[in-house]
């Protein structure tokens, strides 16, 4: 696992993957550790410090892009449902025109060379508008984890 506060590196595996294997992670694996981050988890697998890890795809891409390892060094055993990435938010008290300008600036990054360079630097292809409902999967995962505690 990556970090106790990580959605894709802790919460999602503890809820979704445990449904696949029919057991808690600590009962299924001989040892469960937190590495401190997705990149560190991918490197730990590559270096043989752990046998497997739950790593966000874009974080594995970071390790591959830096030349630390290649995709041939890994076998993907399970892929989770898609979850939304971290949002960019603004204060809702801003005037609607300014909010629209800020949103349009993000949504139009693909339209310029400078914007495309920024997207490449953050390992993204584009920004998309999100709604509160898009994050229901995160709320559902947390509710399922909390229910397991009780």
Please report, for each region that a protein language model flagged, where it lies by residue.
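Bilobed "Venus flytrap"/periplasmic-binding protein-like clamshell domains
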Residues: 1-42, 50, 58
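Second-shell loop/turn segments in exported
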Residues: 1-7, 46-50, 89-91, 124-129
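Extracytoplasmic/secreted proteins, especially bacterial periplasmic and envelope-associated proteins
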Residues: 12, 16, 40, 44, ...
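Short beta-strand->loop
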Residues: 30-31, 64-82
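Short secondary-structure boundary segments
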Residues: 57-58, 92
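Catalytic-face loop-and-helix region of soluble metabolic enzyme cores
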Residues: 86
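An extracytoplasmic/periplasmic, membrane-proximal ligand-sensing/linker region
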Residues: 89-90, 94-150
